[in-house]
Amino acid sequence: MTYRECVLEVARDDAEALSEALFDLGALSVSVEDADADTPDEEPLFGEPGHEPTRLAWNRSRVVALLGDDADPALLVAAAANAIGLSAAPAYTVREVEEQDWVRLTQSQFEPIHIGEHIWVVPSWHDAPQPEAVVLELDPGLAFGTGSHPTTRLCMEWLEQHVQPGERTLDYGCGSGILAIVAKKLGTGETVGVDIDPNAVEASRYNAERNRVEAGFSLPGDAPEGTFDLVVANILSNPLKLMASMLCARVRPGGRLVLSGVLERQAEDVAAAYADAIPLSVWRARDGWVCLHGVKPA
């Protein structure tokens, strides 16, 4: 059977209603995406301090509807637009999606990711490319971050070059747990991951067990107390600025702080939020993103 995807770019205020109308009118599935995802203009909406979900779509939203081969995209889009009171049907494109062995197709699209000198993120259906590699077994779709984003790569490269054996380490905003897991594999001591999303905490625990790593993951209120030799936070600039005093307080005197999720144009503002406690500088930049690091004065 041949399927088709109908792709529409719509205004934020219309995205949710239009997606519901498309589904009610016979679309097999409908999703709403940020049309600017993976660009410097992407918008954070959910699951971040300072970005409460007061709106349910992005400024430039992309609605993707999966249609069966018997559906008429023009009629469906027109009917959906009429159902929600739009004066005109939005422009759309249609692309064919052949029926496939989706498991095999997905696996073919995810190869091992090489990061730094010796770190590899390897899907479970692949073997490690190097016997001496630091290997993280992590499947796409089971996690909130698999090492492909520039900010994750920057943090992992920093860890590979700077981790000291036995350091007490905190990964704040741990997502999939990837940074905490690689830090532990590189030799840190007690290693803790914290996230405000319970699903991320569960994903991190699963990934740590799968990688045979002893690391603790929890919600912020359940996190261990005290300071850390190393604190890593790969989030986004606004929550990083809001959490500056809290994160600085978690770093022991003489300890180090590493931040990413920051665009190059945002680096100065983020560093300014931390300047009174920890002077930060750009360690490395990639694809418009930066990794900031600094040492807390003793």
UniProtKB/Swiss-Prot annotation:
What domain of life does the UniProt record list for this protein's source?
A: Bacteria
Gene Ontology MF terms: protein-lysine N-methyltransferase activity
Under CDD domains, the record lists: AdoMet_MTases
As recorded in UniProt, coiled-coil segments are: none
Q: Name one GO biological process term.
A: methylation
Question: What is catalysed by this protein?
Answer: L-lysyl-[protein] + 3 S-adenosyl-L-methionine = N(6),N(6),N(6)-trimethyl-L-lysyl-[protein] + 3 S-adenosyl-L-homocysteine + 3 H(+)
NCBIfam families for this protein: prmA
Name of this protein: Ribosomal protein L11 methyltransferase
Organism field: Ralstonia nicotianae (strain ATCC BAA-1114 / GMI1000)
Which lineage?
Answer: Bacteria, Pseudomonadati, Pseudomonadota, Betaproteobacteria, Burkholderiales
